[in-house]
Amino acid sequence: MVRRFGLIAVAAAALVLAIVSAASARPAAQAAATASCTKGVSIGMQAPITGPAGSIGSDQLHWAEFYFNQWNKTHKLKIHLVQEDTQLDPSKASTTAQALASNASVMGIIGPAGSDEVQAVAPIFRKAGLAFASGSATRVSLTSGAWKGYFFRDVPNDSVQGPTDANYMFTKLGATSGSSVMVVDDQESYSTGLADIVGQSLAGKGVKVDRESVSQKATDFSSLIAKVTSSTKVVFLPFQVASEAQLFAQQLQAQGKTAVAFGSDGTFDSSKFTVNGSYISFFAPDVTTIPADASVVKAFHKQFPGATSPFGAPNYVLAQAYANAVTKACKDNKISRAEVRKDFAKVSLPNTILGGPLRFTAKGDVAGAKFHIFKIENGKYVTIA
């Protein structure tokens, strides 16, 4: 009898071990939802919290944290933020995406920040049934259809940024027919895509385009700057690292060139790109200058003292959108990744801290948004268009 019970115990233990092993081996797509409308729901976030874009990522994280902290003070339904650091590295983004996808309490994702990162994580999040929404990835093809219903963004894409930048160069910076503009990409997909759009837009206006390319790790731009002539009105720098634009603009001025540096949204960092007289385009307004946002900004600075950049606020809006989607799913007693994803796509906010409404198109793009132009004046980013 003892031996029989021993055999039964061994068999039972083996069965339990097999079940546990099988469960731990389940792909993220099969992770059972464990979110609870009474105990709380989790939203994941991917951002470059450290690394070359750490100041941007920290700002993005802080604005999302701030929204959920404020939400949790006044709502019975608690929303928890699960953060992961990508360092603006697609491989790290993939690794952290797997972790979030495997966390069954996570009902949606804010991020990642970069277009290359979005491409890397998209198959993972789609397989896991998760909505993921970026407050900064602008490459046009990200909403081309492959991830429809899964990927969203609350900032305009480069099909808006490119023509906006080109038109400003043409109408305000002297880049007219017969003159030239140097367009320099940093060999990354976001950069090359935006460079293509700006180059094509300028060429269509009769502007000569000198298309160049450098590594994202380059520090000496003398060979390129030597090609800048008196007819070159603008050097367009659609980089993802602000310090690289800083080096280029400094070297441009040091060599006595009159062309102005013009950075894209990836260079928007007032602590790292500070060359006086340079221009930058950006997908969001500076919320610190919007009177209607004064109380929100004041409360944000109370929790997170110090400077903030326009990179952060779109993530506040995404957090707000997720809060709406989760609330709707809980109201319908259908809390699940699929239900949150469906409700997120239908979110309609009549007004946000970005100065306008939020609604997503069928592709997942934000409807009706625009890019803004800033000029660096004595170390400050001043909105000029």
PLM segments and residue spans:
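Short, low-complexity disordered leader/linker segments with a strong preference
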Residues: 1-42, 74, 385
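Beta-alpha junction/loop-to-helix N-cap segments that form part of ligand/metal-binding clefts
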Residues: 28-36, 55-62, 70-144, 154, ...
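An alpha-beta-alpha
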Residues: 49, 150-213
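Hydrophobic alpha-helical segments within soluble ligand-binding/sensing domains
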Residues: 93, 154-180, 193, 219-221, ...
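Periplasmic-binding protein-like
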Residues: 45, 100-113, 131-135, 179-185, ...
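Segments of small-molecule ligand-sensing domains
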Residues: 302-312, 323-380
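Extracellular/periplasmic bilobed ligand-binding domains
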Residues: 125-128, 194-285
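Extracellular/periplasmic periplasmic-binding protein-like sensory domains
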Residues: 249-317, 330, 377, 381
